């Protein structure tokens, strides 16, 4: 696959937590609260009114155009990381300090946490569906799965 996965192949995200990841992109159609919205045991969206309820976020490059805050979201993300059900990477429309805390605590505990980047909701929509690699410099590179 080539750079046609994005309308703008030079698009780069702002690095919030460094790292690399690869996986299928999951572009959320609506904001999500991790607290009460994601099952920490399965990595499945359980927020009943969410359009993607029932979809697993585990191992995916999760594009969050916006989040619905709860201070407990960091604990849910930490449980997802501990249980091996976390997203491969977090792509946030705007930095969410609460989710980032979950990743930072996981790293402090010696667990591998997903990298996190900021990419506007508009730019997230430009990502084609498919498999991507999030490069260390924040580039979203379409790749074969």
Please provide the spans of the model-predicted regions.
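Feature captures the catalytic cores and cofactor-binding loops of soluble hydro-lyases/lyases
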Residues: 14-17, 26-136
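Phosphate/diphosphate-binding glycine-rich loops and adjacent basic-rich segments that engage nucleotide
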Residues: 137-145
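Polybasic, low-complexity association/targeting segments
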Residues: 2-27
